[in-house]
């Protein structure tokens, strides 16, 4: 039988080489009255993408890829009803989101968690466009000494959102085991090879603020322009020796047996359009965040505290 073709909005840009027609597997979820597609990894080795994908999108051979927010046709590999079980998260990357995905799939009424890592500011754009059910965010505003709310007020004045804490994270400098270069703080970044996070990432915003505090400019840091999209990717750069250090969370350093120099505690929140609070998929997330067993899983990663996990946050209420 012919497969169903539906219009979908892409959550991020998909680059492609002109001259070759490509098929990209996507995870598709229904957000309000539109279908939103998250591009998954490519290549024959990506067995997991087959199980995670709900369809695929064709990139014509004359195109140099497809842009973020573009609406394109997707061929479904599942029934359209299946798309109502996908929870779309767009924003900052955190390892806890993988735990959340795992737990949601194990529920009697499973939901699939489709997460796109575009940084906290990318999450704000997705919320503004109505392209996600929730967004992970950890944007620190030095002016108000508050997280996330100053940015929500500035960029999402017309979107009614509810902010729920996921965890408090330990951010710092990821260094090789034994810290051979004796990196103790931001001042040391002038003498080492650094690996940065992408523009718009909360970690990058924190770094820029710390550099300013130390009286340093981005140009003083060798590798400031080298970017990765996740904490784990930064940690891999340090592990392989491609960089001497990078900013990231303790859990990423611990996962790869690296050392960690703590710099800051930060509040990592889930920002949810209030209209989705009654959605069964979102309610399943909230129930997990309230469960002691899930909080224990978060803390077992290392570098996470859960005193606020599952609680609704209010402006100016840092509570850390």
PLM segments and residue spans:
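N-terminal segment of the mature folded domain
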Residues: 105-184
